Swiss-Prot record:
Names of the cofactor(s): Mg(2+)
Main function: Catalyzes the condensation of isopentenyl diphosphate (IPP) with allylic pyrophosphates generating different type of terpenoids.
Protein name: Isoprenyl transferase
Enzyme class: transferase
Lineage: Bacteria, Bacillati, Bacillota, Bacilli, Lactobacillales
Length: 249
């Protein structure tokens, strides 16, 4: 049982989701409210990510998958995209050492072919540095699109059928899951138990559509840079009140 003190009553958590997905939304609006450029919000968002990752690790969460950059985000202003692509470099220098000290392991899913070399290098260094850590997995969805992930999986499966590796009748949900990008995660925890979206938007925006089939969804008006340990506890508290039926009664 984890307890966080608050003025009116304690937040008590008895059921901790093994895998949490977060759509980190609202950096630009957070900056605008402070009359700052959008990139100011992205920097503040990295502080929030570090704090939430450590808080989740302390709770015993096994995987935290964060939607860092979607395949649709390339349509944003070029200067903003350039800044976002440089964030992994800054993240490695400023935040990864502390996360490494907290036994966090870093992984990445998404289409890496379009990412700049410096971005890829920073991500690979973070992955390599933390690969032997046994704590929480911080899984970045970077240049990720859920529908494209499924299309790519179908193409690979079709090719393997043509190569006579298995028959169409052998295709199951489990086999398809093995062809998705999240196959790099521990088998029992590939699908998020809880998906959190900040900033008040009420949609998944192409985030893990296959894996989210039975995820509990939690939407909050809190902008991502303001999402902290208490906000995480409140989301998990709501998760504790849910009854997950998985299609049953």
């Amino acid at each position: 049982m984890f307890t966080l003190r608050r003025k009116k009553q304690d937040i008590k958590l008895s059921k901790i989701p093994a895998h949490i997905g977060i759509i980190m939304d609202g950096n630009g609006r957070w900056a605008k409210k402070r009359m700052k450029p959008r990139v100011f919000g992205h920097k503040a968002g990295m502080d929030a990510l570090q704090d939430v990752t450590i808080a989740a690790s302390e709770l015993g969460v096994k995987i935290l998958t964060v939607y860092a950059f979607s395949t649709e985000n390339w349509a944003r202003p070029q200067e903003e995209v350039k800044f976002i692509m440089n964030l992994p470099v800054e993240f490695f220098d400023k935040y990864v050492p502390k996360l490494h000290k907290n036994n966090v392991r870093i992984l990445v899913i998404g289409d890496k072919e379009e990412l700049p070399a410096a971005t890829l290098d920073a991500l690979e260094r973070a992955r390599e540095l933390t690969k032997h850590n046994s704590g929480l997995i911080l899984n970045f969805a970077l240049n990720y699109g859920g529908r494209a992930e499924i299309v790519d999986a179908v193409k690979l499966i079709a090719q393997d059928v043509l190569d006579a590796r298995f028959n169409p009748g052998d295709i199951t949900e489990g086999l398809i899951a093995d062809y998705l990008m999240t196959s790099n995660l521990p088998y029992l925890y590939r699908d998020p138990d809880l998906i959190i979206r900040t900033s008040g938007e009420l949609r998944l925006s192409n985030f893990l559509p296959w894996q989210a089939a039975y995820s509990e969804l939690y939407f909050t008006d809190t902008l991502w840079p303001d999402f902290d340990k208490k906000a995480l506890y409140l989301a998990i508290e709501e998760f504790n009140h849910r009854h997950r039926r998985f299609g049953g009664v």
